[in-house]
Amino acid sequence: MINKKISLGVLSILTAFSLQSVSYACTGFIIGKDLTKDGSLLYGRTEDLEPHHNKNFIVRLAKDNPAGEKWKDLSNGFEYPLPEHSYRYSAIPDVTPNKGVYDEAGFNEFGVSMSATVSASANDAIQKIDPYVKNGLAESSMTSVILPSVKTAREGVALIAKIVTEKGAAEGNIVTLADKDGIWYMEILSGHQYVAIKFPDDKYAVFPNTFYLGHVDFNDKENTIASEDVEKVAKKAKSYTEVDGKFHIAKSYNPPLNDANRSRSFSGIKSLDPDSKVTYKDSNYELLQSTDKTFSLEDAMKLQRNRFEGLDLKPLDQMALDGKGKPKSKKAVKGYAYPISNPNVMEAHIFQLKKDIPAELGGVMWLSIGSPRNAPYLPYLGNISRTYEAYQEKSTQYNDKSWYWTVSHINDLVAAHPKPFGTKVIDEMKGLEKTWIAEQDKSTKEISDLVVSDPKAAQEKADKISLDRAEKTFKRLKAIEAKLVKEKPKNKKGLNRS
């Protein structure tokens, strides 16, 4: 997410040691269907900003729009005409729309799924030639404008391209859209430049906040959508770079790789493929990664929970600080880095798409509202029309009826007291997920069969299953929260430590 800063403690560490105090945000991934054990396409993202930032999970119902009505982004002034009819879609919005809606991810009623965005930024030379447009298309509007307007993933990419061409982009972003025919990966590079590719089925990718596209065949119109002046702008900026005699997009548009992007690229690739030849010292990481391994949904969850397990790195948030929240010395920083699973993750989602799931369902979104570090991923089919009430609490401070705030509190308690609480919570969450994965295959098949003959009954069944599971899980999370509060260590005066 652009303009979404990491927590002050971590930011002060990065600033003090020149590790580049820029916006650190989401980490995305894609695993092509040829690389999964069950033939699923897997993709998703962690959404990062800061601790204690509420996220909701809702369904925006289909509606007719009056002629001339526009979408208006209160955070930057962007406007765009609404379609005559907006399609139903699920969303994961912020609760402060005046600062941006940030619908982030979901399915629409035609089975198009979308995750938007992973923020990135062009180098200074590029921005001087094709600067970002203040009231252009931003992450805050992306999902809200695209998902209710398109019937295929390619249509979604084409609509983004049209908007960026006509109105400009407010920021650099990486967007992923998918449907039953596959997934598109799109980089919005500068004010009016973009490139999108149909992602190969036999590759995987991990992408934090920098651009990754290398050489792209612009003549392959079936699998590529690109602005006309991508190369021209790079040449005019004098940042045009070739690799093996061919134009390289990332090397032409990126600033130097910073440490937070390096650590997440490296650890993400190694999480999926420990035998990968990438190193922590690589100057850049390619988007399209190859392997002879196959992956499961659990591997994707493990990736989003990664905190450098098995690597010679330690999470930055575990560093000992002085009384002012700063590192005790430069030497104390050595060996610490910014992980994918960090204190600023507000939610994480994984889309699981299978060829035999009807377009009316789209697939399954596995969703953790709140960081999945000590919280579960719950499955949601793309045809749901309602979400559990605890997902809809809009408070900007702790609220005991809120899913996000309950999970946030659990994460805070476990992080503050790792010795007594250990891995008890996450171990239970993984046990629940294992059960749900087995159950979901069965219910997805049943609802897939039903949707052909009776779409309304299929939707009602999907709603009931997901609502019942969410209610039961939330009650368990409240019990865990209460137990942790009761059992947390007390200070010398006998008071509970937060």
From Swiss-Prot:
Membership in a protein family: Belongs to the peptidase C69 family.
Descriptive protein name: Probable dipeptidase B
Gene Ontology molecular functions: cysteine-type exopeptidase activity; dipeptidase activity
Enzyme class name: hydrolase
Record key words, sorted: Dipeptidase, Hydrolase, Protease
Q: Which gene encodes it?
A: pepDB
Q: Which reaction does it catalyse?
A: an L-aminoacyl-L-amino acid + H2O = 2 an L-alpha-amino acid
The active site lies at 26
Q: Is DNA damage found in the keyword set?
A: no
Record EC number: 3.4.13.19
Its BP terms in the Gene Ontology are:
proteolysis
Which is an annotated Pfam family here?
Peptidase_C69
Is Protease a UniProt keyword of this protein?
Answer: yes
